[in-house]
Amino acid sequence: MWPASQYSHSNMQPHQHKSNEHQNQQNLKTLGMTSAISLAGPKPIDIEKTNELKDALEPFGVFESDQEMHHRMEVLGALHRIVRQWIRDESMRKNMPPNVAETVGGNIYTFGSYRLGVHHRGADIDALCVAPRHIDRSDYFQSFYELLKHHSQVKDLRSVENAFVPVIKMNFDGIEIDLLFARLALKEIPDSFDLRDDMLLKNLDEKSVRSLNGCRVTDEILRLVPNIDNFRLTLRAIKLWAKRHGIYSNTLGYLGGVSWAMLVARTCQLYPNALPATLVHKFFLVFSQWKWPQPVLLKQPDSVNLKFPVWDPRVNVSDRFHLMPIITPAYPQQNSTFNVSLSTRTVIMEEFRVGLAITDEIMLGKCGWERLFEAPNFFSRYKHFIVLLASSATADDQLQWCGLIESRIRHLITNLERNQHITIAHVNPECYNSVPLNTNNGQPLALPPGSVVPSDPAQDSKPNENGALVANYCSMWFIGLVFEKSIVNVDLTFDISSFTESVHYQAKNANMLREAMSIEARHVRRKQLHQYLSPSLLKRERTTSVNKRKHETPAPTAAVKKNKRLSESSTDDVACLSYNEDSNSSNIYEVSIQNGSAPHNAPLADKPAGDKADHASTSSTIACT
C-alpha cells in the first residue's frame, strides 16, 4: 500500500532535500546561468519584513490547514491504490499471470503548484499516472475512465482525450484533480522511481513526453533553487500578486504557474541567501529591467539528442518571434510563454514597474505589503472596450463553450494588435458570469467573481414557442482598447469575424457545437459599462479607484506616454469614477463592428435571414467622444 506520507511536502524525496542542501552550501555561485548578484545574508529588518509578508498573505487563503493537507494526502493515496488495482486488473485481462501482474507497479506523481508546495486553500491538484509499457493510452481513457465513473467518491468526471496534453478531470472526495497519463517503455514501474532520467523518454510518443514534462520541470526547478523554503514563500507572494493584478493566465497570453515559478527561481539563484521579503523586492528589480526577448534560463540546456523538438532560436525560425521566452529546465526544453503577445507583454512589464515602485516603499517602511496585493481598477483605465459574450442553453454547454472561447481569445488579441490604429488590446482574464438571461429581459449582467449562477435543468431544456432552445447562460470577457491617433475611423469587422468564425470552426470539428450556442462581440464605451456590470462590481471598482488615487504613487507618465502603455494620455485628466464622456477630450473614434456575433449553429442551421435571435449584433457604427 502506498503510504499517504509520501505526498507530504515535508517528506517529498528526502534524498533530494539532502543533496539540495549540500549543493546549496558548496555551489551557491554556480546555480543558474550566471554567478549570483549578491551573496549577502539577511539583516534584522529583512526578517521583520518577511514576517510582515507572511501576515499579509494569511487573509488571502494561500496557506491551507493541517486538516486540509492531510485530506489531500488521503485522496492521493486512495487514487494511487485505484491506479494500482486498475493496472493489475488490466494486466491480467491481457493474459499476464497474476503473480507477475502484482509486481508491474504503476505510480501517481504530482506536479505543478502542489508539488512545488505553493498551492492555496481549495486549489486543484495536477497529477500524472505512470504505467508500464503494456498499458495503452486507450486503456486509460476507456477502462480506467469507466472505473472512475462508478467510484462513489468521484464526481464531475470528464475526459479530454484529444487535447494537446490529454487529461482526465475529476472531483475526488471534494478535491479537483487533473490526471495525465504516461506510458513508459518499461516492464514495471517501481515505487521509488525517479522521472528525471532523460533516457526514460527514449522511444516514447510525444503525448507521453508532454505529460511527463510537468513532473520533470517541477522537480528540476526545486533542484535548482538554493533554499526551497524561501523560494516557496516568495512564489506564494508573487502568484497572489499576479492573480490580483490580472496577469496570471497562460491561456490568455499572460504567464502561467510554471512561468512565475521559473522567474522566482531565477531571482533566488541571483540572491541565494536573501529572505522572501528581499526576494520579492529583487524580483521586481530584476524583471522590470529585463531585456526581452533575452531568455530566462535556470541552467545550461541539456545536450540530449532524442530527436524531440526543443526551443532554439538558432535553429527554429518560429522561436525567434517569441516575445518573453522563459525556458523550462528539463529536456526537451520549451518556452513556457509562447502565448505572450505585444499587448500582454506591455501589461506585464507595466505591472513589474509598478510592483517595483510599491516594494521600494515597503522596504523603506512607507507602506505595508497589503498595498502590493490591492487589485487594480481595470475598468477605469480605458474609454473603449470590446465585450465578448458567450451564450448557451445549459450549464454543461456553457462550461465547454467558455473553455473553447477562452482558449482562442489570445488569437483575437493578436488580430487586434495588427490593426494599425490600436496600440493596446488589454484582455481582463476574469470571465464574468451573467445573471440568467431570462431574469433580466434577455440582457447580460455580470456578477461578481465567484458568484453562483442559479440553474434550473428543467427550465434550461424548455424550448421557445418556435420549438428552439433559448440561450439562458451567458459569460463575458472585457478587452480594453487604446487607439493610437486622436481622430480615426476604426473598422474591426474583419478582426472580430475571423475570430468568431475560427471559434465556430473549431467547435464544429470537435463536435461540441450545440443549439443556442452563440458568441458575440460588442463595442462598449466606459459610460455604458453599467449595462454589463452589476452595481456591486461597479461599486468595488469605484472603491478601488478611490483608494489607489489616495495612496498610490503614480508611475512615471513620460514612460507611459512614450510607450503608449495601459491608458490613453488623457485618462489621468478624467475622474476615474465618472462614466460620462470626458467633455474636455478632443479624441473622436468611430468603431465599426459589422456582424460582430456568431449565432448558434450558424454554419449548420438554415435560419431565416431576418431572424433577430440569430443575428443579435448587426451592422453598427458607434461614435465615441
PLM segments and residue spans:
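Extended intrinsically disordered, low-complexity regulatory segments in eukaryotic proteins
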Residues: 461-468, 514-522, 526-625
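Glycine-rich, often proline-containing surface loops adjacent to acidic residues and nearby aromatics
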Residues: 123-128, 214-218, 383-387
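Conserved NTP/Mg2+-binding pocket subregion across the NTase superfamily
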Residues: 155-157, 164-249, 258, 317, ...
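Acidic, Ser/Thr-rich intrinsically disordered and amphipathic helical segments
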Residues: 48, 52, 71-74, 78-82, ...
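N-terminal regions immediately upstream of nucleotidyltransferase
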Residues: 1-122, 134-143, 150, 157-169, ...
